[in-house]
Amino acid sequence: MKVVVCGASGLIGTALRERLVERGHQVVQLVRREPSGPDQVRWDPARRRLDAGALEGVEAAVNLSGAGVGDQRWTPAYQREVLASRTEPTRTLAEALARLEPRPRVLVQGSAIGVYGHRGEEVLTESSAPGSTFLADVVLDWEAAARPAQDAGIRTAFARTGLVMAPGAGAFGRLLPLLRLGLGGPLGDGRQWWSWITLEDEVSALVHLLETDVDGPVDLTGPAPVRNAELTRALGRAFGRPTLLPVPRLALRAVVGGFADEILASQRVLPTVLQRSGFRFAHEDVDAAARWLADAA
């Protein structure tokens, strides 16, 4: 299958590209610089420029574009970038796919469980209502930007990804250096639910969405969400480091700004649609996930 991938140079995109090639798929990358090979196509999503003709023969697309929500302090300017870096590429790609004849069979569209906002003890699934936080609004706009592909009859699966357990990824990119120094501990009071997924399972789930008939929102999280304190203890056991020192809310805000509110948000998400579609996790519990992360780090 010929698959176009946006965001192929990011953490998840790189791993996905490698997995697709291993499975015998042909991968075309969308890049914003001069292409360095025949497997790359240049585009300019900020100006809505993408030659649909360059995508001739594409049967599927995966869109993972977007600035990392935890990469910088949440200034108003960076919040605008977080939104624009998602909606502009998504709309540009969706419109180009809709113009193709024949049209691709599927678009796997990046999304996030941030759509649910801060929900305390509530158990969340794909049928749960959205929240009212900044990230919830971003995700809703992000998913809406893919509508041209949906309206053209392209099966569209929204991969609502949870907290990806991988070296350098999001919240874990902040947590692991502290853990190695023996300074890792629960964030805030540690009672917030964290819906995690390992990078290995994240990539497998994305491939699964390409190769099955699932559409609509799909939560990409492990089957057993845990409280932050429990996850932190599991990491401590896997890395052989103490996890006794809690990280206060004020300290988090000093380092990451408004992103601290997202780190401390409680989201108890279950991957209902993913499991019903027959997906099998390599890492079903947090201890197995933590051991995998320690080996990968």
Identify the function of each model-found stretch.
Residues 3-23:
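N-terminal Rossmann NAD(P)H-binding glycine-rich loop of SDR-like oxidoreductase domains
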